[in-house]
C-alpha cells in the first residue's frame, strides 16, 4: 500500500493540468491520475504515512488543500 497526497480532483483535464503545472513549477513531484471519471492531481507514493504527512504539510504551507489517499 502507498500513501499519496491529493491536491485536487477535476472533471475537466484543463483544470487538472493547470494545478499540476503549478505544483511542478513549485518543485513538487506531482502527477495526474484519471480515475472514476475524474482527473486527480496527486503527489508522491510513500510507503510510510509519516512521509505523506510531511509532504501534506509542505503542500498546505504552499496554499494547497490536501487529502491523503491510499493506493
Segments (PLM) and residue ranges:
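Extracytoplasmic
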Residues: 1-3, 9-71
Amino acid at each position: 500500500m502507498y500513501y499519496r497526497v491529493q491536491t485536487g480532483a477535476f472533471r475537466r483535464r484543463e483544470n487538472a493540468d493547470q494545478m499540476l503545472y503549478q505544483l511542478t513549477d513549485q518543485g513538487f513531484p506531482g502527477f495526474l491520475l484519471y480515475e472514476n471519471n475524474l482527473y486527480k492531481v496527486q503527489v508522491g507514493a510513500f510507503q510510510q504515512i509519516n512521509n505523506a504527512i510531511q509532504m501534506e504539510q509542505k503542500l498546505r504551507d504552499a496554499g494547497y488543500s490536501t487529502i491523503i489517499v491510499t493506493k
